[in-house]
Amino acid sequence: VLIVVQLGVRAALAFRGYFYWDDLILIGKAGTHNLLSPSYLFDDHDGHVMPGAFLVAGAIIRAAPLDWTWPAVTLVVLQLLASLALLRALHVILGWRPVLLVPLTFALFSPLAVPGFAWWAAALNSLPMLAALSWVCADAVLLARTGDRRYALTGALAYLGGLLFFEKAAVVPFVAFAVTALLEYVSGDRDLGAALRETWRAGRRLWVASLALTAAWIALYLGVVNQRRWSSDLVMTGELLARSFTHGIVPGLAGGPWHWDRWAPASPWATPPPAVMALGWLVLAAVVAVSVARKQRIGPVWLTAVGYAVACQVPIYLMRSSKQTALELAQTLRYLPDLVVVLTLLAAVALSAPNRPAGRRWLDASARRTAVTAGLAVLFVASSLYSTSTFLASWRDDPARPYLHNALSALAAAKAASDVPLLDQEVDPLVLQRVAAPENLASHLFALVRDRPEFAPATTQLRMFDPSGRLVAARVTWVRTIVAGPMPRCGYFAQPDHPARLALDGPLLPADWTVELNYLANSDGSMLLSLTQGPAVKVPVHPGLNRVFARLPGAGDAITVRANTTALALCLASGPVGFIAPA
């Protein structure tokens, strides 16, 4: 029943969401690459190696371009798999006991896992990893108990599946080893060293296979990912880590943060009120006190929990941190879904520990204890649902949704009106910024849309997307001007064996520029345009007096024009070079 309720909440979150940032990058890549090519599957996606996520995303995007329905369905299905795998792991550790509901409730409703679920690109990484994490932990415990080799095989396969979606899944065998060893330690009378040795011996087949997979994946990762992205800013990493505890993890123990802020195009970040932060610390203190008073041998369990809370975040902060990094990065909470699962599994291990023989009687099983536990669980769920609802309100404040809806309608109308191509251009920076180039180009984002004009590097009718996604008439701004040519009544003259150098009235810095070129041609054909420093762009020409707009990447103080067709002669006049703006 709890899983069904969770799926209802997550379905509402999924279907009321929309594409955001990396989702649009995935759309652009799926529209411009072969889905089975190594360059697509093993692309360095901002430090991630995720062929499984690329393949799933690409297949869905190809089947229904820019349709949010199927990404939302995948979110719910993947969440179901992750939740069922966690339930299996809790059952393996605790059995079908009512106490199982305590850690399960925390895992299913904790707001700490919500941001990583709502963002499709992030969920394609984390949810398969969470399913693999729970499954491998359960298999490791069962292998240690029964010695059945099939658990070594299924555990290794599940681990490989997690790696295919997220390189962070490399933590899975280490978490599984820790959970199995701690369960062995708290359930018996061995010391911790003996429990570790027994865990290695009993699960050796799984551990050796997992280490081999880990080594191979590390080699692949190092070969794919640009290692220069790593930072050595330990001070900023420490500040991010501290902020994740004070504004994320600790308030999350009480169902916080309750409140979120957002400045587009950033994703929401947690801004818990002081009361929620204080409540989180009280909950943490109470859980530590009650667990220590009730259970024996759980010191290593708590140390492991704290250690993982630090270790699971340090690599990502080392990769993301710099002097310009905002501390709000740690408050987005999207790096914490695996921590929720690990804390849940460790809680199950702690609940398996023997009670203290001289423990407090009010902690013994009774109707009163059951009522108090149920009441606290209801309060936690209510607090968590409130945090989830406020997150959703912030998450839905996304400029991509109206922009893409308007753009799709505008593209369809433009296609119906004429066959004139659209000049390729960047989409609005609140939707996708230049740092994502070339996926921020309209030709990439809308590559799979069928009902649209072609995108081209040149056009005779200049139009642009305005900030709302509508197509409007456009002009070229006068950043620089083509100086009038030397030939009377012609300007600049170009033939196949006689290129023309069109001087500008000043230099251009490196950028994607647009030129308005007025020309007179004697026949159909094409010409090649290029800045002093930049690639050549092929532009079609037509006989007579015409005007063409072309997108020219590069820099320099002149434009070179080469006639690209035999017997083609061109006269070229002055015009602006700059950016496109509404007319």
Name each model feature, range by range.
Residues 323-355:
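Hydrophobic/aromatic-rich transmembrane helices and adjacent perimembrane loops
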Residues 76-79, 85-102, 108, 120, ...:
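Transmembrane alpha-helical segments of multipass membrane enzymes and assembly factors
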Residues 98-117, 124-135, 151-159:
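Membrane-embedded helix bundles of polyisoprenyl
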Residues 2-43, 47-51, 57, 61-69, ...:
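Intrinsically disordered, polar/acidic, low-complexity terminal segments
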Residues 296-324, 377-380:
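Transmembrane alpha-helix segments characteristic
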Residues 142-160, 165:
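Short hydrophobic alpha-helices at membrane interfaces in multi-pass membrane enzymes
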Residues 17, 45, 49, 70-77, ...:
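Membrane-embedded glycan-lipid processing machinery
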Residues 172-215, 219:
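Perimembrane helix-loop-helix junctions
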